[in-house]
């Protein structure tokens, strides 16, 4: 991809095609992820997603950080005032780094493509950078919605590269058509400014009573 970043693990993150490749990539990246993504490239999506959730949720609500990685998104949620945070990821080394942040009440290993947990277990969920090449299928967004209570929000942060493929926008349309959730907002802005990558923050509200 012509405008993909070219340094370190980030340079090949957009070339991943399978779950096995993705798991191996992120397990090897865990030790330097925060430096490369957060410090060197100014990862903007965690703070943008946390701010979007703060506009529609109470700070005391129970939030699941889906694909929490090393915990950059959890720290952003904490900084936005949220204190009841759980996180999940499919990479144990990433979860070990997330535990070091001290912001999560519970961390657990999970593969969003195969199942996440109990129905209606959380007030809200965030998925920052989770839906991308080789990561999670767009239809797995339905699994995130399943574990959020009716009326709860799901905030998704996605880079322009994946958004422009069209699979995620199509899935959002299908979710609305099926009556599962409504898209409350879509905001375009910085995703990874150090690599000149923009992205979207989407807020869905789960349907039901």
Summary of predicted features, one role per range:
Residues 1-32:
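N-terminal, positively charged/glycine-rich alpha-helical extensions of SAM-dependent methyltransferases
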């Amino acid at each position: 991809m012509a405008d993909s970043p070219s340094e370190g693990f980030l340079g090949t993150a957009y070339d991943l095609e399978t779950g096995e490749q993705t798991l191996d990539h992120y397990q090897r990246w865990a030790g330097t992820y925060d430096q490369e993504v957060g410090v060197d490239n100014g990862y903007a999506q965690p703070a943008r997603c946390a701010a979007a959730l703060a506009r529609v949720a109470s700070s005391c609500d129970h939030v699941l950080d889906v694909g929490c990685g090393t915990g950059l998104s959890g720290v952003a949620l904490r900084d936005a005032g949220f204190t009841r945070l759980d996180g999940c990821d499919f990479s144990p080394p990433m979860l070990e780094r997330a535990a070091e942040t001290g912001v999560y009440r519970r961390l657990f290993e999970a593969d969003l493509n195969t199942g996440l947990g109990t129905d209606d277990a959380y007030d809200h969920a965030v998925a920052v950078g989770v839906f991308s090449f080789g990561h999670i299928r767009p239809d797995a967004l339905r699994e995130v919605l399943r574990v959020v209570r009716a009326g709860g929000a799901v905030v998704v942060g996605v880079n322009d590269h994946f958004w422009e493929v069209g699979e995620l926008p199509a899935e959002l349309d299908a979710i609305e058509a099926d009556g599962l959730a409504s898209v409350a907002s879509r905001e375009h802005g910085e995703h990874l400014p150090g690599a000149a990558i923009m992205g979207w923050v989407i807020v869905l509200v789960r349907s039901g009573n």
